[in-house]
A protein has these predicted regions:
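Scaffold/interface architecture of coatomer-like assemblies
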Residues: 29-333
Length: 333
């Protein structure tokens, strides 16, 4: 080998080794966080950096999911836009978007697999969930989060409802309950869904004892988002009358109410089946209404919304359920 070739080969070897060391440093940076310690999966930290801080939405157009029922709790569809009145901070608003179509929904299923859901609770909940899926729109999009001591994404964005049920077939109940963390992750995930209409279905006994996020943080997030939460409280035996059972019911009620949804507490497997079917029907018999506030300002304040509906002549009073307001977050536009 000539001297020139020898020098060239040495240079190439040095460059190769330097590249390996550089790649090694890059790999180490990806595997370890800034403190030099092994990084945790996103859902094991405070549900990942992408969840820190509020969810910011474009508040130029305020969109509402509105449920209308009669005195017997039956869903009322087919109302015209002129039947609705929107008030923001007591001021009438002009409706710029209106639809009562049976449109598909992005649905996040949040399923409690903690120790308190053991025995018949989880079995009955799995069976009742199949009623929800059978009654839902064929184009609905699902994802599944199971939670005990931490929240874990088991299934990400599928139109196959049976895949959701299959994932739950062999799940075992154990450990504590990170309910707030699961809901927080659920809001973040469902807001990236394919469909403009978004909902969470929370299936739990409502008892949180292991979350990093607090109840107030989750409540604020739900008020900021356009996600409707439905809760099904799985209370067995003497749970309903116990202090923990009462606390769980109060938590689910409040989380559902601030989002414009509703919480249910079935007393039997038959009633549970009916409730899951009822939630699916509600999602298919809602109105989507949008408006641009007449005096919109990114002031970060809470703006109260009231939706009124005037029944057609000769019909009795109708009842409306929707979000009660929004935060106009600076920088949202």
């Amino acid at each position: 080998m000539c001297y020139t070739s020898y020098i060239l080969n040495c240079h190439l070897a040095i460059l190769y080794l330097t590249g390996l060391r550089h790649f090694s440093r890059l790999l180490q940076f990806n595997l370890f966080n800034s403190t030099g310690k092994p990084g945790k999966p996103a859902v094991q930290q405070k549900l990942g950096n992408e969840l820190d801080g509020p969810v910011i939405v474009n508040t130029d157009l305020i969109t509402l999911t509105v449920t209308v029922t009669d005195t017997y709790g039956r869903y009322v569809s087919g109302l015209a836009q002129k039947a609705f009145t929107i008030l923001e901070d007591k001021q009438p608003q002009e409706i710029t978007y209106f639809s009562d179509d049976d449109s598909p929904v992005s649905v996040g299923v949040l399923f409690d697999v903690s120790g308190s859901m053991s025995g018949d609770k989880i079995k009955q909940a799995r069976e009742a969930l199949s009623k929800f899926i059978q009654t839902s729109h064929n184009s609905d999009e699902y994802f599944l989060i199971a939670f005990n001591a931490r929240a874990q994404l088991l299934l990400d964005r599928t139109r196959d409802g049976n895949a959701v049920l299959d994932k739950l077939t062999f799940v075992q109940t154990r450990n504590n309950t990170a309910l707030y963390d699961a809901c927080y992750l659920g809001v973040e995930k469902v807001q990236r869904g394919l469909h403009p209409k978004r909902a969470l279905l929370l299936i739990s006994d409502g008892q949180d004892n292991n979350s990093r996020y607090s109840f107030n943080e989750l409540r604020r997030l739900l008020k900021e988002s356009d996600v409707v939460l439905y809760g099904v409280g799985i209370l067995g035996g003497g749970d309903a009358g116990s202090s923990l059972g009462m606390e769980g019911q109060g938590i689910m009620d409040e989380l559902a109410n601030v989002s414009g949804g509703k919480a249910f507490f079935p007393r039997s497997p038959v009633e549970m089946d009916d409730i899951f079917e009822q939630i699916a029907l509600e999602l298919r018999h809602q109105y989507s209404i949008g408006y641009k506030p007449t005096n919109f300002a990114n002031d970060g304040k809470w703006h109260k919304i009231k939706v009124k509906v005037t029944p057609p002549r000769g019909l009795p009073r109708l009842f409306v359920r929707s979000k009660e307001g929004y935060y106009a977050i600076p920088g949202a536009r």
